[in-house]
């Protein structure tokens, strides 16, 4: 069985960032879709998912949080680990479930969606909640792996901190 990704290991987290906020969102990671053109003009189909993400972020901050965690001018660094949902062929008998994952499967496999679109969706969802604007993000490490925990339905781990560079 593949190993779990350790977010605190030296190969994932650099010494120049000390994490102050983290979030784990269950479910298959969502990429940033491209804007679409419809009868009524241009629209962004990610609006609903973005609102759900912002609600999850606000819930972790608690009711006492007012304003953004990192105001304008504060450089931010972060780590995003996207654990992608496994396909049915990765499970014994083609039936997903806990303890049904085949042995010796790779943790990393080049699959859709693109890692940059996964990161863009998360960065945009954190706008106005964790930081004022995602232009404050000066360092970002993104890892896309296949989930190997439980039923392998996917999850996203996000850690954000002030960047000391």
Write out the residue ranges for each language-model feature:
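Acidic, proline/glycine-enriched N-terminal capping motif
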Residues: 2-165
């Amino acid at each position: 069985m593949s190993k779990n990704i350790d977010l605190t290991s030296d190969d994932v987290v650099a010494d120049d960032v000390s994490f102050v906020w983290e979030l784990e969102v269950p479910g298959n990671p969502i990429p940033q879709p491209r804007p679409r053109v419809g009868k009524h003009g241009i629209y962004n189909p990610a609006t609903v998912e973005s609102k759900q993400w912002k609600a999850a972020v606000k819930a972790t901050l608690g009711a006492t949080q007012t304003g953004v965690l990192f105001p304008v001018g504060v450089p931010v660094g972060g780590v995003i680990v996207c654990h992608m949902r496994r396909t049915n062929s990765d499970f014994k008998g083609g039936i997903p479930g806990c303890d049904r994952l085949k042995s010796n499967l790779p943790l990393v496999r080049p699959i859709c969606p693109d890692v940059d679109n996964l990161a863009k969706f998360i960065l945009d969802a954190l706008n106005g909640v964790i930081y004022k604007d995602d232009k404050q993000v000066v360092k970002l490490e993104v890892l896309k792996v296949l989930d190997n925990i439980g039923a392998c339905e996917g999850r996203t781990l996000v850690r954000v901190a002030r960047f000391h560079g």
